[in-house]
Structures are given as structure tokens and as C-alpha cells.
From Swiss-Prot:
CDD domains recorded: Ribosomal_L18_L5e
Taxonomic placement: Bacteria, Pseudomonadati, Pseudomonadota, Alphaproteobacteria, Rickettsiales
Domain of life where this protein originates: Bacteria
Gene3D superfamilies in the record: 3.30.420.100
GO terms, molecular function: 5S rRNA binding; structural constituent of ribosome
GO biological process: translation
Organism: Anaplasma phagocytophilum (strain HZ)
Gene Ontology, cellular component aspect: cytosolic large ribosomal subunit
Cystine connections: none
Function comment: This is one of the proteins that bind and probably mediate the attachment of the 5S RNA into the large ribosomal subunit, where it forms part of the central protuberance.
Protein's name in the database: Large ribosomal subunit protein uL18
Pfam family, one: Ribosomal_L18p
Keywords on record: Ribonucleoprotein, Ribosomal protein, RNA-binding, rRNA-binding
Gene coding for it: rplR
Amino acid sequence: MSLFDLKRAERRRRRVRLKLRSLSSIRLSVFKSNRHFYAQLIDDEAGRTVAAASTLESEVLAVASRRVNAGAVKIVAKLLAERISGLDAAYRKFVFDRGSYRYMGVVAAFADELRSLGFEF
């Protein structure tokens, strides 16, 4: 990525986070690289991560290829849903923090899978 692209991504990330701060104290943050995808449910009031899942886990590594794709991301969404469902009902409603990533591709596939599993955001 060029320096211009990095600056534009940083501005987009800050803009998204600023808007999310006013909405809710519980957010689902995602990070993706070329090889892996990470998602974590963060309680900003308590300052801690409530639940997390990624493509580094053995259930996903057995199925996924060397690069992150929609199939692997759907498995990560199911793992995260299992971990959240065991928690308090307040954690079923949160805001989706896509960071600097556009809502397309694996980010959109992850969000759609979570919505189909009954989460509201």
C-alpha cells in the first residue's frame, strides 16, 4: 500500500470509531490481514475483551486455506456466536466496528453470518 492509501485508511478508521463511541459501549471489532481474520467483542466501559475468535484456531485452520476467505470467516462467526451465547443477554446487541475496512468481501460475509445467527447490530 502506498503512503496515501495508509493515511486514507487511518482517517476512515478514526471516522468510524468516532461515530461508534456515541452509540454503544459494546462493540464488535474486526481486523483482517492477508492470511488471517480476527474478531473480538469489546466492552468499552469495563475496558476488557468479552469474547474473541480468529482464523488461528484449530477448528478453522483444519478447513481454511492459507489465505482468509468467506468460508473461513463464516466459521469464525459461528465460533464467536457460540462464545457470546453463553454470556449475558446484553451482549447480543452491539455495534459493528469495521475499522478501516470497507463493508465488502470477508467483512460483509462475517457480518451477514452473525446476523443470520440472530445477533443485532
